[in-house]
Amino acid sequence: QRASQDMYNTEAACAIYRNFLDWLFATFEADEATWRKAMAARLRVTPGQKVLVTGCGLGDDIPAILELVGPEGEVHAQDLSPAMTIEAASRWAQDRPEQARQISFSTGNALRLPFADHVFDAAFHFGGINLFDDVGQGMAEMNRVVRPGGRVVVSDEGVGPWLKDTDFGRMVVTNNRLWGLEAPIRKLPATAADVVLGWVLGNCFWVIEFTVSDATPRLNPHVPHKGRRGGTMWTRHRGLLEAVTPEMREKVERAAARAGTSVHDWLESALAKRLEQTQDGER
């Protein structure tokens, strides 16, 4: 995350970042407060719950999240930049002291979060993960600290792929090369459930949402296929043997058809008989 640290941990970083946000929402003709409320709603949190915000910047997403978790809820806001977290904490203490007790600010690396497993009800990130040294690890850490059933919402620059080869797409990528990046959907943990991929702000920012789960999708791989080939998902995946000639394959298919069975069942039977004969000979 050296790129993020170099960019945002300077005396002028807070003003530069706020200037960028003002430009961003003006450019896409979006009301920032309304937009952030809509993004926070994707977390599906309820009053009294605990939310983690990684890459919190100046804490601009916190008001919308606090509105959802209510006076008994908590927000833990993390950023790599000390300048950002100090400024954000100072603003909350000065402007909203009655709510500041609900917020914990910390400076640290989002790739190694200092939290136990499953301690949050949801996790949120907007506008920084593209610069992480390891995007997949950033996703994995949010997944780790959120309880099963909790929601993770992550968003950053990346124009929709259907726009990349248009004049619009070339214009926005020329303005900011990060908008040329792909949504890192392949970086999700294998256990991610209820996954949603979309785009916001002129389709120039991708949004990935998923529910934390403790297992990969459920299925029964042993249900037999009906028809000529037969077998199951499991046998087709794990039971492949050495290749045979096309002529031998045709002979097997014809033999299975004459026997009124699937190719899988015919092969299982033929191989079992052959192995039995071999074992008898060895005795």
Which stretches of residues belong to each language-model region?
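Conserved class I S-adenosyl-L-methionine
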Residues: 1-45, 60-64, 94-95, 151-176
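Class I SAM-dependent methyltransferase SAM/SAH-binding core
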Residues: 50-112
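Short amphipathic alpha-helical segments
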Residues: 101, 241-244, 252, 256-272
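A short acidic, Gly/Pro-enriched loop at the edge of an enzyme's catalytic core
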Residues: 111-122
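A short glycine-rich, Lys/Arg-flanked "PGG" loop and its adjoining helix->strand segment in the class I
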Residues: 136-148
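Short alpha-helix
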Residues: 175-192
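Short Lys/Arg-rich basic patches
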Residues: 220-247, 256, 265
